[in-house]
Structures are given as structure tokens and as C-alpha cells.
Amino acid sequence: MVEHYPFKLNSEFDPQGDQPQAIEKIVKGVKEGKRHQTLLGATGTGKTFTMSNVIKEVGKPTLIIAHNKTLAGQLYSEFKEFFPENRVEYFVSYYDYYQPEAYVPSTDTFIEKDASINDEIDQLRHSATSALFERDDVIIIASVSCIYGLGNPEEYKDLVVSVRVGMEMDRSELLRKLVDVQYSRNDIDFQRGTFRVRGDVVEIFPASREEMCIRVEFFGDEIDRIREVNYLTGEVIREREHFAIFPASHFVTREEKMKIAIERIEKELEERLKELKDENKLLEAQRLEQRTNYDLEMMREMGFCSGIENYSVHLTLRPLGSTPYTLLDYFGDDWLVMIDESHVTLPQIRGMFNGDRARKQVLVDHGFRLPSAMDNRPLKFEEFEQKTNQLVYVSATPGPYEIEHTDEMIEQIIRPTGLLDPKIDVRPTKNQIDDLLSEIQERIDRDERVLVTTLTKKMSEDLTTYMKEAGIKVNYLHSEIKTLERIEIIRDLRMGTYDVVVGINLLREGIDIPEVSLVVILDADKEGFLRSNRSLIQTIGRAARNEKGEVIMYADKITDSMQYALDETQRRRDIQTAHNEKYGITPKTINKKIHDVISATVDNDETNEKQQTELPKKMTKKERQKTIENIEKEMKKAAKDLDFEKATELRDMLFELKSEG
């Protein structure tokens, strides 16, 4: 039974600027049943806050799709702060590293699937799907992986093992049910997706939980007591009357269905082998027979096999070629989709199917997979459209799809801080580097930062070297730098370790920096992807978080894209200036906290340790408790990774925190 809870928005601010009218229009549109709406929100106008207010007013389960994991992570943190009492979940691909299986016919090379699964993200995925069956105040932040195949939601829901105090059930029946939903018994290494047995006590570690296990105590053939327990310390967290244990895998199938699925796979194998032999593809036939029979044997014995998702069409007993189940099917009938940065995310959703199909076709043709493996795939764009109900697109520069499907753009141009879109100055390319250096020096003297965008890697490198020789603290952002390193460089720019960052594509995640007062666009008149009207507006927006924000474009002619960007920016400035004059608002630079890099990258440098040991003196009781929990988590992880020195340091830190409490 899905429980009802209202969305409770936690914020010290009320909607300001353009936010109230944008919220009102979107909410009205959703309530009137509008299918497509677009929020055209300029950079820095508080689009996330607007989205949060819409969710609160509409009160529907919501899926928010971002175009990469990092952006999804940022949104997840923000929405968790806005909705601490509701279920905010995170659903992205659980692979830290993923090499899909592939075959290169020209060199006769088969590349086996190789992947490293992030256990924490897997737990968050299970938490997301189980939340949708437990309550209706759910917000799931997802990457495009939400359109990839997942198990049948009905099967997932029906196979839930429900335990209740006073229920008649003997211990062995519970153990059997747990094995059916792919939990395994492990009395020694107790981890997610396992259970352990001690006399009349069964402890289960749900796949959707991080540190909490369920202790079920029996008295004869009756459940006597259910408790939530910390799996490591054994400390009882609370008593429970009832608990629902969701399957340990999304690809879970009942025994009788598994038998039918195996029969279907055998039948398909027989037909496919005949086809291959008729075409005289004997090597391919032998390869397919050997691989498929091995998988079938594993399914009979264990209930699953490696790469079981390739048989998903049979396991869910769907007709060949039918639409796969995805996260979208786990939502009920009445729900909302918000697509963040829709001008990037929608083309990504559109392109997923074709890329996946091309690779799988080669595997099928050469006998590595049955043709039905093609049905383990992401959704086609038309299927995505059919499965979604109401959509809100969010972007500073909506793409053609959003423009075509929305009758009215809901504009959010006025910033709560009164900040204007930056002034734009177009200058000739003659002596541009000397001119640029003098502009940078002016900003350094005012303790402000600069972003410079170039067109080629070589130019970025040469410019960076030249600036370093001129004594400027500069770093260079390029595509080979890992996501977390990018975030670190941005953080260092904000903190003043660097004054300038040079890069080709500065539109990627995490580049909203209030300290930046100047954005420089070199070769602005070279038409192309990086100098299209959409890219130019996005790049200009990077200077819109500082009251002294300016943009300099170096160009010898004004292209159509430049003209569009100049006109659109001026249009927005006029609206913003009129609003400020009407209400007597003075623009002021955003004051944004400098967050540490995502916790997955714990720094070990002295400053970090010093900072952490100083924390207790200036923390509230709630913050202290949260810090204790985080350090405990890191300590256990360090011990598990055999990094005992780090675990000892963290333990000492814990003692200090607890003694201060």
C-alpha cells in the first residue's frame, strides 16, 4: 500500500524576482493537464528553487532527468536540502567503469563485458525503486540511464517479502522466500543482499539500505519481534510492527516463470542455430550454442547468470521486439517529469537507442548473443514520449523540440539578487592577447576571476603557457581531465589558487562561479557548435553571477549567432533593469558557499584534517550527529579496504567529536 505524505519544502527564502509568476504558470499548466511546458530560465535565476516549489504545489511523484552523473549528484544534494522530510532518491548507472561486450569482425576480437559496479549507487537505485512502492512523496534524480531496461515492476512488487509481528510463518519458510528474491545466506560476510541465521533469529540486510539490517525473532511458528538494527554495532535503532523486503535484484523472476523463460530461450536458440547453419556460419553456431547453454545451466541451478539482462524479454515473458520495462514503469499513472538542461538531455535520450543497437547487431550476427538480446535496450524516443505523462523542460536555451511542443515559453529572467545579464563588448582580434592580459590584470587587482574560452586544444595550451610565463595563476580545463578533478579546479579558482581558467567547452557541469567577473570568448566569429547562438548564450551566462560581470568577444565580424546572442542578452538586460528601477533593487553578487568536493573523493591533506578536527567547536547538535555518522561510515570503509592508519585517525576524530557532544 502506497502511503500518502505531502511535500514539505525547507527554505528560509520565499520565491522572488521572476520565480513567483513562473511557479504559478507551471503549476496551473500541470493542474490543467498540459503535457509539455518549458521554463526558460536565465543563468542564476534560481531554476532549482522554482522546480522545488512546483513539486511542492503539484504534489506528484517526480522524475528529474539530468544529462550526466555529476549534474545529477549536484541536483540530488540540492533537492535533499529542500525536502529533508520527503524521499529524495538518486538513480544513475551503477558502473564506475563499464566496457560493454563487443566484437570487432576485422580483427576477430571479442571484448568481454567488463564492469566495476559501485555498491553505494546500486543501493541508491534499490532505494529509489522501493520508495515508489512505499509512498507518494518521491523525487528521483536520474541520469539518462533511467531509460535503460529494468525488471518487470509488477514482478518486483509482487515478490516483496512482507514480515509482520504476530504473523504465522516458520523460520525455514522465510529463508526460502528470501532465496527466491535473490538474497543469499552468509553468516560470515554480512552485506547488502544477504541474510544470516542465529537460532530463532534471522537478520536480513535489505538491498536498499546502507547500514541498517532487519532482525526478525521467531517464537515457534510465529514472528515474535521485528527490529531495525545497526548491522555493525548491533545497536537497536527502533522496533517495527511491519517491514517489506524488496528483491535483491531488479531482474527477479518467479520459479515457474523462470521455467517458461528457459523453454522460450531454448526454442529461440534452436531456431537461430538452424538459421546460422543454413547460412554455413558453423563457427558462429557453435559459439552461440556453447555460450547460451552455459547461461541456461546457470539459470537452472542458481536462478541467474552473468549478463542475465540479455534475456530480459524472455524473463518478463514479453513478445520479441516489445518495449522494455524501465524506471519509468515503476511510477504510477499520475506523475511528473522534469528535464534539466533539456537542450542537452533530450538529444541524449534520442541518441541512446541507435548507439546501443549498432553494437548489439554485430554480437548477434557473429553468434555471441541470441537476436532477443536486442530487446535489452534503452527506449526509443517515441517510446519515451508514450511512457511519460506530463513534462517540464528546464533550460536557459531551449532546443527545437521544446520550442515546437510548447505553446508558450515560461520565462524566468529576473534574478532574486537583481543581477543583470553581463555587458558584452565585441573587439577586433588584432593585438587580442595583449589586450586580454591587461583586462585579466585589472580583474586580478580587484580579486576577481576570469574564464577564457578558445576553439582548439592547442590554442588553450599555448595561451595557458603564455599566461604562466607572464606570471598569471592559470589552469587549463580539457576533456581528458576527470569529472572530479574538474570540480576541484573550479573550487580552486573560486578560492583564489588560480585567477584564470582557460578551456574549450566551459559549459559543462559546475561552472557557476560568482567570483567570475569576466568571460572572454576568443574566435567568437568562427561559426560552429562551440560558437552557435545557444553555446554563446550559455557561455555569456557564466558572467551573470557577479555585479561587475562583463563579456569580451574577440571577432573581426559579427555572425548571425553573435547577433542573436547580443540581441537576446540586451533584451534580458532591459527587462532586468526595468524591474530593478521599479522596485529600487541594487544588484549584488551572489554569495555562494564553497563546498568541498563530493565526499567520494576524500582528501587526505593536512588542511582537510585540521579543518575536520576544528569542526566540533562550531557545530550544532544536528550537524555534529551528521558528521559523526559520516566519519563512522568512512572509518568502516577504510577498515574494509585494509587502510588501518586512516581508520585509526578517523576513530580518534570520532572520540573527539563524541566527547565534545
UniProtKB/Swiss-Prot annotation:
ATP binds at residues 41-48. It is found in: Cytoplasm. A motif (Beta-hairpin) lies at residues 94-117. The gene is uvrB. The beta-hairpin motif is involved in DNA binding. It comes from the Bacteria. It comes from Staphylococcus haemolyticus (strain JCSC1435). Keywords: ATP-binding, Cytoplasm, DNA damage, DNA excision, DNA repair, Excision nuclease, Nucleotide-binding, SOS response. This is UvrABC system protein B. Residues 607-617 have a biased composition (Basic and acidic residues). Gene3D superfamilies: P-loop containing nucleotide triphosphate hydrolases, UVR domain.
